[in-house]
UniProtKB/Swiss-Prot annotation:
Designated name of the protein: Proton-coupled zinc antiporter SLC30A2
Record has Phosphoprotein as a keyword: yes
Gene behind the chain: SLC30A2
PTM sites of type Phosphoserine: S296
Domain of life: Eukaryota
Organism: Homo sapiens (Human)
Residue numbers on the Lumenal membrane side: 162-175, 242-249, 326-372
Regions crossing the membrane: 141-161, 176-196, 221-241, 250-270, 305-325
Post-translational modification summary for this protein: Phosphorylated at Ser-296. Phosphorylation at Ser-296 prevents localization to lysosomes. Dephosphorylation of Ser-296 which triggers localization to lysosomes, accumulation of zinc into lysosomes and lysosomal-mediated cell death is induced by TNF-alpha.
Chain sites annotated for binding Zn(2+) 1: H106, D110, H223, D227
BP-aspect Gene Ontology terms: intracellular zinc ion homeostasis; response to zinc ion; zinc export across plasma membrane; zinc ion import into lysosome; zinc ion import into mitochondrion; zinc ion import into organelle; zinc ion import into secretory vesicle; zinc ion import into zymogen granule
Keywords for the protein's UniProt record, in alphabetical order: Antiport, Cell membrane, Cytoplasmic vesicle, Disease variant, Endosome, Ion transport, Lysosome, Membrane, Metal-binding, Mitochondrion, Mitochondrion inner membrane, Phosphoprotein, Transmembrane, Transmembrane helix, Transport, Zinc, Zinc transport
Length: 372
């Protein structure tokens, strides 16, 4: 297209024209329509790339169906947890059982952690602001961290009470009431576990199933596993005490053993939370594989400042500087690199800066990749 013809199109005021054969909508993440004062060359380059992150996500991108499912799971589980917690407090009081009462306290922690998770999910859905320009995505991660820490606090209290009972030996337990209450507790924990369980599909798209799991639901699920272990310990103790009342020391011993096991179940969640907060490379995204994929794009000579991190466990983000050879179409490189990254790794956001390649990049320490 000649320069004069371009200028004529820019100055023209009659009907709106589309240069790609489709209506481009301004305000919905699309390239604006040509009007006086706009750079037509920039419009043509943008049209050539045919790639825009917000347009891909669509207007309903903030209504994440996975997040909605997580909220429904937590609502149902928290309602079940609250109702049975009240019943277990009554049963523990009637049975004079510390194990049942501490199991009820564990349920209280489960309930509180689910409320924290629901609050964090609501916070993470709030739009970005000028101050919080990434949005509130990591409120979910902070909620999971608080849930894990609350497990540790309650577990410490349970261990302390179990040791205290072993030392004093001054307690009596109603084995029958304890047996009924603990049996119901096991059943309720199984129901809550099934409600919160997240099953992944059998094939992979470059991410692991753990990446697809909601961290708040995972934290709540671990809470339920811990409480299930505690309830099983109480059930075993109740069964023994029902037939052998003189073996009352079984109650604090079971509480002590199963409380220790709870701590181990929190380590995987804590590891994921720390990885996100420290902006480490997310699980399921291999740094070397990403680098090799970018270098395989035609025209790419080198790259530097490759950073891969995550807003949350399931939202990996990438930024990189790509150096291209002379006479290479920058928009073609940008389009190819972006589409390959999205196709293989499903990044939430990709930011690529195109630069001209120079020979001194080979010896520049700042341009070298990070160590293993």
């Amino acid at each position: 297209m000649e320069a004069k013809e371009k200028q004529h199109l820019l100055d023209a005021r009659p009907a709106i024209r589309s240069y790609t054969g489709s209506l481009w909508q301004e305000g919905a993440g699309w390239i604006p329509l040509p009007r006086p004062g706009l750079d037509l060359q920039a419009i043509e380059l943008a049209a050539q790339s045919n790639h825009h992150c917000h347009a891909q996500k669509g207007p309903d991108s903030h209504c994440d169906p996975k997040k909605g499912k997580a909220q429904r799971q937590l609502y149902v589980a928290s309602a079940i947890c609250l109702l049975f917690m009240i019943g277990e407090v009554v049963g523990g009081y009637l049975a004079h059982s510390l194990a049942v009462m501490t199991d009820a306290a564990h349920l209280l922690t489960d309930f509180a952690s689910m409320l924290i998770s629901l609050f964090s999910l609501w916070m993470s859905s709030r739009p970005a602001t000028k101050t919080m320009n990434f949005g509130w995505q990591r409120a979910e991660i902070l909620g999971a961290l608080v849930s894990v820490l609350s497990i540790w606090v309650v577990t410490g209290v349970l261990v302390y009470l179990a040791v205290e009972r072993l030392i004093s030996g001054d307690y009596e337990i109603d084995g029958g009431t304890m047996l009924i209450t603990s049996g119901c507790a096991v059943a309720v924990n199984i129901i809550m576990g099934l409600t919160l369980h997240q099953s992944g599909h059998g094939h992979s798209h470059g991410t692991t199933n753990q990446q697809e799991e909601n961290p708040s639901v995972r934290a709540a699920f671990i809470h339920v596993i811990g409480d299930f272990m505690q309830s099983m310990g109480v059930l075993v103790a109740a069964y023994i005490l029902y037939f052998k009342p003189e073996y009352k020391y079984v109650d604090p011993i079971c509480t002590f053993v199963f409380s220790i096991l709870v701590l181990g179940t929190t380590l995987t969640i804590l590891r994921d939370v720390i990885l996100v907060l420290m902006e480490g490379t997310p699980k399921g995204v291999d740094f070397t594989a990403v680098r090799d994929l970018l270098l395989s794009v035609e025209g790419v000579e080198a790259l530097h400042s490759l950073h891969i991190w995550a807003l949350t466990v399931a939202q990996p983000v990438l930024s990189v500087h790509i150096a291209i050879a002379q006479n290479t179409d920058a928009q073609a490189v940008l389009k190819t690199a972006s589409s390959r990254l999205q196709g293989k790794f499903h990044f939430h956001t990709v930011t690529i800066q195109i630069e001209d390649y120079s020979e001194d990049m080979k010896d520049c320490q700042a341009c070298q990749g990070p160590s293993d």
